[in-house]
Amino acid sequence: MPNPKPRTTHPQITAGLRQFATQQKLTPNTVYSQFFREVFLAELMDTDPVWVLKGGTNLYCLIPGARHTQDLDLYRQTSPTSHRDAADALISAMHRMQVGPYTFEVRNPRKESVSGTIENIQLTVIVRFGTTEFSRFNIDVSGDLEAPTVTESLAVTRTDPLKVPFARQHFTVLSYPIENQLADKTCAMYEIHGTRGSTRYRDLYDIGLIALELEVDAEKLRTALEQQSRIRALTLPPRLVLPSDEWPAGYKKFVGTLHQPRPELRTVESALTTAEALLNSVLSLDNPITVGRWSPEQRQWSPQPKSPGPST
């Protein structure tokens, strides 16, 4: 295989991304957005390496080929950690950051929200080529999360194969613990806003995907579930169930929007069965698993191996 030719100019880069979009059966705008989000993320982690990646992009970094998301979800794990101050710190670090022929403008339209007691603020990033806006994406900045301190970096490879001298093909991120992400998604499935139940079909899909692909620590997951249910003031069911009668039709419609969904998760019944295998033993009130590791290959919990005792 010949080495890909370097692409340094805007026309060269966009031509390469369009070609990649055609190969992947994606729209050019989807690939443009993914490229610039990853370039931005690599620069942020290099400039201000105290940010932790969560949400769909975190899952995509852990499981290449996971569903695409259209924004970044981030939080700071060192001061300032409140959502407003953290957002200001991100703007200070990245506003008007130049990378190759592109400039990132980070704006704060003050779109704030609350999930339980977790406050978020949404920033908008505009990617300019010269003075022209070429792409844009959003960043959701969360404040004051209860989560373990992340110390180990996760190696990430940029999604596209282009050789772009100013855009790192490989970079590292701090990744939100998968047990906490599972707890967030489980609780979000049962959170009620107003009078309507949850319609977060993507969370069931993602829980199933985690069950198929990643190891999970039982003790850390139980701790995270207890924290999130307390923060959101909700009581989780003793086993995973569909939140409402809307879910079979709603989930089917959601899966229809995905690019190459996993065959094991195409129906709500198969997704629920896969997610149940991971979560029911932890949610159980009668005999919950408290120690062990989830094996995605075996799709079951295994006892945690004991540490070897002192040699005699």
What are these regions (language model features)?
Residues M1-W51, Y60-Q70, R76-T312:
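Structured mid-to-C-terminal alpha-helical surface segments
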